[in-house]
Amino acid sequence: KKPGLVVHEDDDNTPDTLIHRILHYLYNKGEYRPEEENSFVPALCNRIDRNTGGIVIAAKNAAALRILNQKIKDRELSKKYLCLVHGVLQPKAATLKDYLVKDGEQNRVRVFHQPVPNGKTIITSYKTLKTNGQISLLEVDLKTGRTHQIRAHLAFYGHPLVGDTKYGTNAMNKGNTHRYQALYAYKLRFDFSTDAGILSYLNGKEFTVDHVSFADEI
């Protein structure tokens, strides 16, 4: 999906959503018949933020949804992200482990080095692909999948995403031309260690978005 598109209806009852587009597409192909009694409604298996672009998985039938949800839970699918951050990370590649707490009132999360009440462990691996000394392009692998994890975790270490007004600073974003934070779920791989039934044909397959616009800015 493109940045700016919500995956599901939100509190504003946004009519244009990713799932609505998917249902419309499948209806036109004759693969979704809402008028039929007990018809399965295709559903999303994962979500990404409104302002994040990238690969999202949808299931067209109940069996696929059940299998994919279990595979995601068992971490038999891997997703990688590209992002632009302020500054140069040292070391160039590392795995960060900290704790995250959701702040519902502020619609944001907070990160801590030590365990805190209601805190959940977050693990984020990153690798610097290139840098110009002021901004860096990273490939990020989430070992845990928490709300705003990449954005908040990297900002916690002093390297917020370019264009991120929630976790960045006004000074860093001065002169920014990005409408959304520079974050994209660009790679998905299926590595099944157990039987996947009707989806076994996906095992070992990898899907990659060939061109992410902000990756060319360095």
Region spans (language model):
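Short, well-ordered beta-strand segments enriched in hydrophobic/aromatic residues
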Residues: K1, L138-D141
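RNA pseudouridine synthases
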Residues: K1-G104, P117, A215-E217
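Beta-strand-connecting loop/turn residues
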Residues: G53, G133-Q134
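Intrinsic-disorder/low-complexity, polar/charged segments enriched in Ser/Thr/Lys/Arg/Asp/Glu/Gln
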Residues: S78-K80, T95, T121-I123, I135-L137, ...
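A structural micro-motif recognizing beta-strand termini
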Residues: H86, V140-K143
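Hydrophobic residues embedded in beta-strands of well-ordered beta-sheets
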Residues: N107-V109, S136
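Pseudouridine synthases involved in rRNA/tRNA modification
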Residues: V116-I123, T128-G133, K143, T147, ...
